[in-house]
């Protein structure tokens, strides 16, 4: 199926230490970027959350403390991730209530200006199925 895009869109998913966007941390972010010319770019960043990953969270996504202990923290990747999604619409499952708020919190903690996210358009596929 060919999408008729007016601007690039990034489908993204986070794996995290929990479900609280204000306090929990990202341990992995995966992004599929679709350009208007159908070009696709996939990126995955494994991230050290700098705190223990609860067993409950690891049982869901399979990422353990051992797997991230030697990975850089979010701040290390923050500019690269921001540049990758800058100017794109964003899409995913539950992005409006969880993924995007948590991502914005991580950017704020990394001193990234998040004012551009005020204007970002999102497609939250969770709303399609509710």
Which residues are covered by each model-predicted region?
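Short alpha-helix plus adjacent loop in nuclease-associated cores
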Residues: 120-130
């Amino acid at each position: 199926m060919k999408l008729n895009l007016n601007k690039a869109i990034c489908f993204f998913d986070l794996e995290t230490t929990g479900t609280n966007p204000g306090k929990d941390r990202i341990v992995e972010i995966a992004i599929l970027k679709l350009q208007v010319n159908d070009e696709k770019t996939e990126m995955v960043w494994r991230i050290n959350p700098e705190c223990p990953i609860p067993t409950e969270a690891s049982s869901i996504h399979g990422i353990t403390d051992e797997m991230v202990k030697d990975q850089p923290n979010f701040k290390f990747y923050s500019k690269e991730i921001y540049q990758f999604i800058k100017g794109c619409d964003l899409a995913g499952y539950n992005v409006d209530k969880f993924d995007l708020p948590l991502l914005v919190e991580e950017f704020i903690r990394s001193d990234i200006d998040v004012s551009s996210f005020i204007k970002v358009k999102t497609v939250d596929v969770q709303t399609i199925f509710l």
